[in-house]
Protein backbone atom coordinates (compact mmCIF):
# COMPACT_ATOMS: atom_id res chain seq x y z
CA UNK A 1 0.00 0.00 0.00
CA UNK A 2 1.30 3.48 -0.82
CA UNK A 3 2.69 5.56 2.03
CA UNK A 4 1.23 8.71 0.48
CA UNK A 5 -2.00 9.91 2.16
CA UNK A 6 -5.07 9.75 -0.01
CA UNK A 7 -6.33 12.99 1.47
CA UNK A 8 -5.77 15.20 4.47
CA UNK A 9 -8.08 15.41 7.47
CA UNK A 10 -9.56 18.71 8.54
CA UNK A 11 -11.82 19.42 11.47
CA UNK A 12 -15.01 20.78 9.97
CA UNK A 13 -17.02 20.36 13.15
CA UNK A 14 -19.46 17.68 14.19
CA UNK A 15 -21.99 16.10 11.88
CA UNK A 16 -24.37 15.57 14.74
CA UNK A 17 -27.86 16.22 13.38
CA UNK A 18 -30.05 13.18 13.91
CA UNK A 19 -31.71 13.20 10.51
CA UNK A 20 -29.28 12.33 7.76
CA UNK A 21 -31.32 14.23 5.22
CA UNK A 22 -30.34 17.33 7.22
CA UNK A 23 -26.67 16.40 7.57
CA UNK A 24 -24.61 18.77 5.47
CA UNK A 25 -21.19 20.35 5.35
CA UNK A 26 -20.72 23.00 8.07
CA UNK A 27 -22.82 26.11 7.60
CA UNK A 28 -19.72 28.26 7.18
CA UNK A 29 -19.24 26.71 3.74
CA UNK A 30 -21.58 25.99 0.91
CA UNK A 31 -20.76 22.86 -1.11
CA UNK A 32 -19.24 24.99 -3.88
CA UNK A 33 -17.24 27.05 -1.39
CA UNK A 34 -16.00 23.93 0.34
CA UNK A 35 -14.72 22.52 -2.92
CA UNK A 36 -13.00 25.79 -3.78
CA UNK A 37 -11.46 25.90 -0.33
CA UNK A 38 -10.20 22.36 -0.75
CA UNK A 39 -8.51 23.09 -4.05
CA UNK A 40 -6.90 26.24 -2.70
CA UNK A 41 -5.65 24.99 0.66
CA UNK A 42 -4.80 21.36 -0.15
CA UNK A 43 -6.07 20.45 3.32
CA UNK A 44 -9.17 18.76 1.95
CA UNK A 45 -9.42 16.50 -1.03
CA UNK A 46 -12.73 15.41 -2.46
CA UNK A 47 -12.54 12.67 -5.04
CA UNK A 48 -15.08 12.05 -7.74
CA UNK A 49 -14.96 8.96 -9.89
CA UNK A 50 -17.14 6.97 -12.18
CA UNK A 51 -20.33 7.89 -13.97
CA UNK A 52 -23.97 7.47 -13.06
CA UNK A 53 -27.17 7.12 -14.95
CA UNK A 54 -29.52 10.08 -14.67
CA UNK A 55 -32.23 7.97 -13.08
CA UNK A 56 -31.88 6.50 -9.62
CA UNK A 57 -30.63 2.93 -9.46
CA UNK A 58 -30.73 0.30 -6.77
CA UNK A 59 -28.09 -0.94 -4.39
CA UNK A 60 -28.36 -4.72 -4.70
CA UNK A 61 -26.12 -5.76 -1.82
CA UNK A 62 -24.01 -4.44 1.05
CA UNK A 63 -21.27 -6.45 2.72
CA UNK A 64 -18.83 -5.74 5.54
CA UNK A 65 -15.57 -7.68 5.98
CA UNK A 66 -13.83 -6.71 9.25
CA UNK A 67 -10.30 -7.86 10.06
CA UNK A 68 -7.32 -6.61 12.02
CA UNK A 69 -5.55 -5.83 8.72
CA UNK A 70 -8.35 -3.59 7.45
CA UNK A 71 -12.14 -3.41 7.20
CA UNK A 72 -13.84 -3.49 3.82
CA UNK A 73 -17.34 -2.18 3.11
CA UNK A 74 -18.76 -3.12 -0.29
CA UNK A 75 -21.86 -1.73 -1.99
CA UNK A 76 -23.03 -3.60 -5.07
CA UNK A 77 -25.02 -1.53 -7.53
CA UNK A 78 -26.97 -2.01 -10.74
CA UNK A 79 -25.02 0.70 -12.59
CA UNK A 80 -21.80 2.68 -12.34
CA UNK A 81 -21.58 4.98 -9.34
CA UNK A 82 -20.69 8.61 -8.78
CA UNK A 83 -19.56 9.40 -5.27
CA UNK A 84 -17.94 12.07 -3.11
CA UNK A 85 -15.78 11.36 -0.06
CA UNK A 86 -14.73 13.51 2.86
CA UNK A 87 -12.72 12.85 6.02
CA UNK A 88 -13.80 14.74 9.14
CA UNK A 89 -11.73 14.98 12.33
CA UNK A 90 -12.57 15.11 16.05
CA UNK A 91 -14.20 12.66 16.26
CA UNK A 92 -12.87 10.90 13.16
CA UNK A 93 -15.52 10.17 10.54
CA UNK A 94 -15.59 9.23 6.89
CA UNK A 95 -18.46 10.75 4.91
CA UNK A 96 -19.42 9.30 1.53
CA UNK A 97 -22.17 10.77 -0.66
CA UNK A 98 -23.46 8.42 -3.36
CA UNK A 99 -25.35 10.03 -6.22
CA UNK A 100 -28.10 8.54 -8.35
CA UNK A 101 -29.08 6.01 -5.69
CA UNK A 102 -32.37 5.39 -3.97
CA UNK A 103 -32.36 4.73 -0.22
CA UNK A 104 -33.80 1.22 -0.21
CA UNK A 105 -34.08 -1.59 2.32
CA UNK A 106 -30.64 -2.93 1.36
CA UNK A 107 -28.95 0.33 2.36
CA UNK A 108 -31.10 0.50 5.47
CA UNK A 109 -29.60 -2.83 6.54
CA UNK A 110 -25.99 -1.55 6.40
CA UNK A 111 -25.76 -0.14 9.97
CA UNK A 112 -26.85 -3.50 11.37
CA UNK A 113 -23.95 -5.26 9.67
CA UNK A 114 -21.31 -3.55 11.82
CA UNK A 115 -19.86 -5.75 14.54
CA UNK A 116 -18.86 -4.35 17.94
CA UNK A 117 -15.57 -6.20 17.45
CA UNK A 118 -14.77 -4.31 14.23
CA UNK A 119 -11.30 -2.83 14.77
CA UNK A 120 -11.99 0.39 12.88
CA UNK A 121 -15.74 1.13 12.55
CA UNK A 122 -17.77 2.26 15.55
CA UNK A 123 -21.03 2.63 13.63
CA UNK A 124 -22.46 3.62 10.26
CA UNK A 125 -25.35 5.98 9.68
CA UNK A 126 -27.05 5.92 6.30
CA UNK A 127 -29.90 7.93 4.85
CA UNK A 128 -31.07 10.31 2.12
CA UNK A 129 -29.13 13.58 2.17
CA UNK A 130 -30.88 15.35 -0.70
CA UNK A 131 -32.86 14.16 -3.73
CA UNK A 132 -30.98 11.38 -5.48
CA UNK A 133 -28.13 11.36 -2.95
CA UNK A 134 -27.55 8.90 -0.12
CA UNK A 135 -25.05 9.81 2.58
CA UNK A 136 -23.00 7.34 4.60
CA UNK A 137 -21.40 8.63 7.79
CA UNK A 138 -18.89 6.12 9.16
CA UNK A 139 -17.90 6.86 12.75
CA UNK A 140 -14.41 5.51 13.39
CA UNK A 141 -12.67 4.06 16.43
CA UNK A 142 -9.33 5.53 15.40
CA UNK A 143 -7.64 7.38 12.57
CA UNK A 144 -7.58 5.48 9.29
CA UNK A 145 -6.10 5.70 5.83
CA UNK A 146 -9.05 4.92 3.51
CA UNK A 147 -8.91 3.63 -0.03
CA UNK A 148 -12.16 4.08 -1.95
CA UNK A 149 -12.56 2.78 -5.48
CA UNK A 150 -15.00 1.17 -7.89
CA UNK A 151 -14.92 -2.23 -9.57
CA UNK A 152 -16.52 -3.21 -12.84
CA UNK A 153 -18.81 -6.26 -13.02
CA UNK A 154 -17.14 -9.66 -12.99
CA UNK A 155 -18.61 -13.10 -12.51
CA UNK A 156 -21.76 -12.87 -10.41
CA UNK A 157 -20.93 -9.39 -9.12
CA UNK A 158 -22.33 -6.16 -10.53
CA UNK A 159 -20.72 -2.73 -10.17
CA UNK A 160 -19.09 -2.34 -6.77
CA UNK A 161 -18.12 0.62 -4.64
CA UNK A 162 -15.41 -0.49 -2.22
CA UNK A 163 -14.41 1.31 0.97
CA UNK A 164 -11.19 -0.13 2.43
CA UNK A 165 -10.38 1.30 5.85
CA UNK A 166 -6.71 0.72 6.72
CA UNK A 167 -5.04 1.75 9.98
CA UNK A 168 -3.12 5.01 9.71
CA UNK A 169 0.01 3.06 10.66
CA UNK A 170 0.29 -0.20 8.66
CA UNK A 171 0.45 -3.38 10.71
CA UNK A 172 3.91 -4.94 10.77
CA UNK A 173 3.33 -8.68 10.24
CA UNK A 174 6.59 -9.54 11.99
CA UNK A 175 5.65 -7.61 15.13
CA UNK A 176 2.12 -8.99 14.97
CA UNK A 177 3.55 -12.49 14.85
CA UNK A 178 5.75 -11.83 17.87
CA UNK A 179 2.94 -10.19 19.83
CA UNK A 180 0.34 -12.82 18.94
CA UNK A 181 1.38 -15.10 21.72
CA UNK A 182 4.54 -14.05 23.51
CA UNK A 183 4.25 -16.76 26.10
CA UNK A 184 3.85 -19.57 23.58
CA UNK A 185 6.76 -18.24 21.52
CA UNK A 186 9.02 -18.22 24.56
CA UNK A 187 7.92 -21.75 25.40
CA UNK A 188 8.72 -22.88 21.85
CA UNK A 189 12.18 -21.33 22.05
CA UNK A 190 12.86 -23.08 25.36
CA UNK A 191 11.74 -26.42 23.96
CA UNK A 192 13.90 -25.93 20.86
CA UNK A 193 16.87 -25.24 23.16
CA UNK A 194 16.15 -28.47 25.03
CA UNK A 195 14.39 -27.05 28.10
CA UNK A 196 11.39 -28.68 29.77
CA UNK A 197 9.10 -29.66 26.89
CA UNK A 198 5.38 -29.33 27.54
CA UNK A 199 3.30 -32.42 28.18
CA UNK A 200 1.01 -31.36 25.36
CA UNK A 201 3.71 -31.58 22.72
CA UNK A 202 3.00 -34.41 20.30
CA UNK A 203 5.34 -35.57 17.55
CA UNK A 204 3.93 -35.14 14.06
CA UNK A 205 4.87 -38.69 13.14
CA UNK A 206 7.25 -41.49 14.04
CA UNK A 207 8.72 -42.11 10.60
CA UNK A 208 12.47 -42.36 10.31
CA UNK A 209 14.51 -39.78 8.49
CA UNK A 210 12.55 -36.68 9.55
CA UNK A 211 14.30 -35.80 12.80
CA UNK A 212 14.98 -32.07 12.83
CA UNK A 213 18.30 -30.74 14.07
CA UNK A 214 18.35 -27.03 13.30
CA UNK A 215 19.84 -23.96 14.95
CA UNK A 216 16.74 -21.74 14.96
CA UNK A 217 13.00 -21.63 14.60
CA UNK A 218 11.61 -22.35 11.14
CA UNK A 219 9.04 -19.78 10.01
CA UNK A 220 6.29 -21.08 7.73
CA UNK A 221 3.69 -18.81 6.16
CA UNK A 222 0.33 -20.47 5.53
CA UNK A 223 -1.88 -18.84 2.94
CA UNK A 224 -5.57 -19.84 3.02
CA UNK A 225 -6.73 -19.23 -0.54
CA UNK A 226 -9.37 -16.63 -1.45
CA UNK A 227 -11.47 -14.86 1.23
CA UNK A 228 -13.90 -11.99 1.62
CA UNK A 229 -15.48 -10.98 -1.67
CA UNK A 230 -13.71 -13.90 -3.36
CA UNK A 231 -15.32 -17.20 -2.29
CA UNK A 232 -13.11 -19.32 -4.55
CA UNK A 233 -14.70 -22.45 -5.98
CA UNK A 234 -18.14 -23.41 -4.69
CA UNK A 235 -19.17 -27.05 -4.25
CA UNK A 236 -22.52 -28.47 -5.30
CA UNK A 237 -23.61 -28.48 -1.66
CA UNK A 238 -22.75 -24.81 -1.34
CA UNK A 239 -19.36 -25.25 0.35
CA UNK A 240 -17.05 -22.27 -0.17
CA UNK A 241 -13.41 -22.93 -0.94
CA UNK A 242 -12.41 -19.91 1.17
CA UNK A 243 -14.04 -21.51 4.22
CA UNK A 244 -12.38 -24.93 4.04
CA UNK A 245 -8.95 -23.50 3.18
CA UNK A 246 -9.05 -21.27 6.26
CA UNK A 247 -10.14 -24.16 8.47
CA UNK A 248 -7.37 -26.46 7.22
CA UNK A 249 -4.76 -23.69 7.48
CA UNK A 250 -5.75 -22.94 11.08
CA UNK A 251 -5.44 -26.62 12.00
CA UNK A 252 -2.04 -26.79 10.32
CA UNK A 253 -0.89 -23.64 12.11
CA UNK A 254 -1.79 -25.13 15.49
CA UNK A 255 0.18 -28.29 14.69
CA UNK A 256 3.20 -26.33 13.45
CA UNK A 257 3.18 -24.06 16.50
CA UNK A 258 3.19 -27.16 18.73
CA UNK A 259 6.53 -28.22 17.24
CA UNK A 260 9.60 -27.24 19.29
CA UNK A 261 11.38 -25.69 16.33
CA UNK A 262 8.65 -24.21 14.12
CA UNK A 263 6.19 -21.36 14.04
CA UNK A 264 3.46 -20.51 11.55
CA UNK A 265 1.98 -17.25 10.30
CA UNK A 266 -1.35 -16.95 8.47
CA UNK A 267 -1.80 -14.48 5.62
CA UNK A 268 -5.41 -14.19 6.79
CA UNK A 269 -6.98 -15.47 9.99
CA UNK A 270 -10.60 -14.68 9.16
CA UNK A 271 -12.89 -14.11 6.18
CA UNK A 272 -11.39 -11.14 4.34
CA UNK A 273 -9.68 -10.54 1.01
CA UNK A 274 -5.89 -10.33 0.70
CA UNK A 275 -4.43 -9.36 -2.72
CA UNK A 276 -2.01 -11.91 -4.14
CA UNK A 277 0.95 -9.54 -3.97
CA UNK A 278 0.31 -8.78 -0.30
CA UNK A 279 0.27 -12.49 0.52
CA UNK A 280 3.78 -12.82 -0.86
CA UNK A 281 4.85 -9.59 0.79
CA UNK A 282 3.74 -10.84 4.22
CA UNK A 283 5.91 -13.92 3.78
CA UNK A 284 8.97 -11.84 2.96
CA UNK A 285 8.42 -9.44 5.85
CA UNK A 286 8.58 -12.26 8.40
CA UNK A 287 11.64 -13.84 6.72
CA UNK A 288 9.67 -16.98 5.92
CA UNK A 289 11.52 -20.22 5.23
CA UNK A 290 8.54 -21.71 3.43
CA UNK A 291 5.28 -20.45 1.89
CA UNK A 292 2.31 -22.81 1.51
CA UNK A 293 -0.89 -21.70 -0.22
CA UNK A 294 -3.87 -23.92 0.63
CA UNK A 295 -6.66 -24.39 -1.92
CA UNK A 296 -9.43 -26.73 -3.02
CA UNK A 297 -9.55 -27.72 -6.67
CA UNK A 298 -12.55 -27.56 -9.02
CA UNK A 299 -13.39 -28.70 -12.52
CA UNK A 300 -16.40 -28.68 -14.81
CA UNK A 301 -16.70 -32.47 -14.54
CA UNK A 302 -17.74 -33.65 -11.06
CA UNK A 303 -15.78 -36.89 -11.51
CA UNK A 304 -12.40 -35.12 -11.20
CA UNK A 305 -10.83 -36.02 -7.87
CA UNK A 306 -7.61 -36.17 -5.87
CA UNK A 307 -5.00 -33.96 -4.23
CA UNK A 308 -2.26 -32.05 -6.08
CA UNK A 309 0.81 -29.96 -5.35
CA UNK A 310 2.06 -27.13 -7.57
CA UNK A 311 5.24 -25.06 -7.75
CA UNK A 312 6.18 -22.04 -9.82
CA UNK A 313 7.43 -22.46 -13.37
CA UNK A 314 9.85 -20.01 -14.98
CA UNK A 315 8.78 -21.24 -18.38
CA UNK A 316 5.53 -22.80 -19.52
CA UNK A 317 3.12 -24.83 -17.44
CA UNK A 318 3.78 -28.54 -17.02
CA UNK A 319 0.31 -29.36 -18.37
CA UNK A 320 -2.77 -27.72 -19.85
CA UNK A 321 -4.61 -28.31 -16.58
CA UNK A 322 -1.82 -26.63 -14.61
CA UNK A 323 -1.93 -23.59 -16.90
CA UNK A 324 -5.73 -23.39 -16.61
CA UNK A 325 -5.54 -23.62 -12.82
CA UNK A 326 -2.89 -20.90 -12.60
CA UNK A 327 -5.02 -18.58 -14.74
CA UNK A 328 -8.03 -19.25 -12.50
CA UNK A 329 -6.14 -18.63 -9.26
CA UNK A 330 -4.40 -15.53 -10.64
CA UNK A 331 -7.84 -14.02 -11.36
CA UNK A 332 -8.55 -13.88 -7.61
CA UNK A 333 -7.59 -10.20 -7.43
CA UNK A 334 -10.24 -9.32 -10.02
CA UNK A 335 -12.99 -11.10 -8.09
CA UNK A 336 -11.82 -10.20 -4.60
CA UNK A 337 -11.40 -6.58 -5.61
CA UNK A 338 -7.93 -5.04 -5.69
CA UNK A 339 -7.39 -1.29 -5.88
CA UNK A 340 -5.43 -0.86 -9.11
CA UNK A 341 -4.91 2.80 -8.27
CA UNK A 342 -2.38 1.85 -5.58
CA UNK A 343 0.76 0.40 -7.11
CA UNK A 344 2.71 -2.27 -5.26
CA UNK A 345 6.40 -1.76 -6.07
CA UNK A 346 7.32 -4.97 -4.26
CA UNK A 347 5.05 -7.02 -6.49
CA UNK A 348 6.45 -5.34 -9.59
CA UNK A 349 9.97 -6.27 -8.52
CA UNK A 350 8.88 -9.81 -7.77
CA UNK A 351 7.27 -10.32 -11.14
CA UNK A 352 10.40 -9.04 -12.87
CA UNK A 353 12.76 -11.27 -10.89
CA UNK A 354 13.97 -14.03 -13.16
CA UNK A 355 16.66 -15.48 -10.86
CA UNK A 356 14.39 -17.97 -9.14
CA UNK A 357 15.94 -21.24 -10.29
CA UNK A 358 17.34 -22.22 -6.89
CA UNK A 359 14.11 -21.31 -5.10
CA UNK A 360 12.03 -23.28 -7.61
CA UNK A 361 14.25 -26.32 -7.12
CA UNK A 362 13.67 -26.12 -3.36
CA UNK A 363 9.94 -25.67 -4.01
CA UNK A 364 9.93 -28.87 -6.06
CA UNK A 365 11.72 -30.70 -3.25
CA UNK A 366 9.27 -29.67 -0.54
CA UNK A 367 6.38 -30.21 -2.95
CA UNK A 368 7.50 -33.78 -3.60
CA UNK A 369 7.81 -34.42 0.13
CA UNK A 370 4.32 -33.09 0.85
CA UNK A 371 2.76 -34.84 -2.15
CA UNK A 372 4.13 -38.17 -0.94
CA UNK A 373 2.36 -37.70 2.39
CA UNK A 374 -0.91 -36.59 0.78
CA UNK A 375 -0.97 -39.86 -1.14
CA UNK A 376 -1.41 -41.64 2.18
CA UNK A 377 -4.74 -39.97 2.93
CA UNK A 378 -6.28 -39.29 -0.47
CA UNK A 379 -6.08 -40.19 -4.14
CA UNK A 380 -3.46 -38.16 -5.98
CA UNK A 381 -4.78 -36.27 -8.98
CA UNK A 382 -1.25 -36.14 -10.37
CA UNK A 383 1.64 -38.29 -9.15
CA UNK A 384 4.21 -35.53 -9.70
CA UNK A 385 4.52 -31.92 -8.57
CA UNK A 386 3.15 -29.75 -11.37
CA UNK A 387 4.36 -26.31 -12.35
CA UNK A 388 2.72 -23.15 -13.68
CA UNK A 389 2.92 -19.36 -13.34
CA UNK A 390 1.06 -18.84 -10.06
CA UNK A 391 1.39 -15.21 -8.96
CA UNK A 392 1.15 -16.17 -5.29
CA UNK A 393 4.24 -18.40 -5.59
CA UNK A 394 6.54 -15.72 -7.01
CA UNK A 395 8.61 -14.81 -3.95
CA UNK A 396 12.13 -14.98 -5.43
CA UNK A 397 13.79 -16.19 -2.22
CA UNK A 398 11.20 -18.37 -0.45
CA UNK A 399 10.40 -21.97 -1.44
CA UNK A 400 6.68 -21.87 -2.22
CA UNK A 401 4.05 -24.48 -3.03
CA UNK A 402 0.32 -24.47 -3.69
CA UNK A 403 -1.66 -27.44 -2.38
CA UNK A 404 -5.00 -28.45 -3.88
CA UNK A 405 -6.36 -30.46 -0.96
CA UNK A 406 -9.18 -32.13 -2.92
CA UNK A 407 -11.79 -31.36 -5.58
CA UNK A 408 -14.59 -29.32 -4.06
CA UNK A 409 -16.51 -29.86 -7.32
CA UNK A 410 -16.60 -33.61 -6.60
CA UNK A 411 -19.53 -34.34 -4.22
CA UNK A 412 -17.60 -37.04 -2.33
CA UNK A 413 -14.52 -34.90 -1.90
CA UNK A 414 -16.63 -31.87 -1.01
CA UNK A 415 -17.99 -33.91 1.89
CA UNK A 416 -14.41 -34.79 2.88
CA UNK A 417 -13.36 -31.17 2.85
CA UNK A 418 -16.05 -30.25 5.37
CA UNK A 419 -15.21 -33.22 7.62
CA UNK A 420 -13.18 -32.35 10.72
CA UNK A 421 -11.33 -35.65 10.68
CA UNK A 422 -10.25 -35.27 7.05
CA UNK A 423 -9.14 -31.68 7.65
CA UNK A 424 -7.06 -32.92 10.57
CA UNK A 425 -5.55 -35.71 8.47
CA UNK A 426 -4.72 -33.22 5.73
CA UNK A 427 -2.97 -30.92 8.21
CA UNK A 428 -1.00 -33.86 9.67
CA UNK A 429 0.08 -35.03 6.21
CA UNK A 430 1.28 -31.56 5.20
CA UNK A 431 3.22 -31.23 8.45
CA UNK A 432 4.91 -34.60 7.92
CA UNK A 433 5.97 -33.46 4.45
CA UNK A 434 7.33 -30.20 5.86
CA UNK A 435 9.34 -32.01 8.53
CA UNK A 436 10.82 -34.43 6.01
CA UNK A 437 11.90 -31.56 3.78
CA UNK A 438 13.59 -29.56 6.55
CA UNK A 439 15.24 -32.69 7.96
CA UNK A 440 17.15 -32.94 4.68
CA UNK A 441 17.35 -29.21 3.94
CA UNK A 442 17.98 -27.25 7.17
CA UNK A 443 17.25 -23.55 6.70
CA UNK A 444 20.00 -20.97 6.86
CA UNK A 445 19.93 -18.18 9.43
CA UNK A 446 17.99 -15.19 8.09
CA UNK A 447 17.50 -12.87 11.04
CA UNK A 448 18.46 -12.41 14.67
CA UNK A 449 14.81 -12.66 15.61
CA UNK A 450 14.61 -16.15 14.19
CA UNK A 451 17.79 -17.43 15.81
CA UNK A 452 17.84 -19.40 19.05
CA UNK A 453 21.46 -18.84 20.04
Please give the residue ranges for each predicted region.
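Flexible glycine-/small-residue-rich
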Residues: 77-79, 98-100, 140-142, 165-167, ...
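Active-site-adjacent mobile loop/cap segments within catalytic or ligand-binding domains
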Residues: 290, 300, 351-453
Amino acid sequence: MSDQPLFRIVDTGPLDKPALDEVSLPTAFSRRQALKFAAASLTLLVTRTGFAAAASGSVMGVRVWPSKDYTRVTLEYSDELKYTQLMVADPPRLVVDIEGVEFNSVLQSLPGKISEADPYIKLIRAGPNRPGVVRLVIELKSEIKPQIFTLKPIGEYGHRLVLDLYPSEPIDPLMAMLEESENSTEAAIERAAGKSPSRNDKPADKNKGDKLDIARLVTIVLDPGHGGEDPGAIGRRGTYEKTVTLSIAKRLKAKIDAQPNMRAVLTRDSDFFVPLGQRVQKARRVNADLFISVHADAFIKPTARGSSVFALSEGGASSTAARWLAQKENAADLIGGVNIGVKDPYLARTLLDLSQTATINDSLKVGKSVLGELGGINTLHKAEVEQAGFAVLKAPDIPSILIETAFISNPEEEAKLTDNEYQDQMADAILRGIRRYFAKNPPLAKSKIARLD
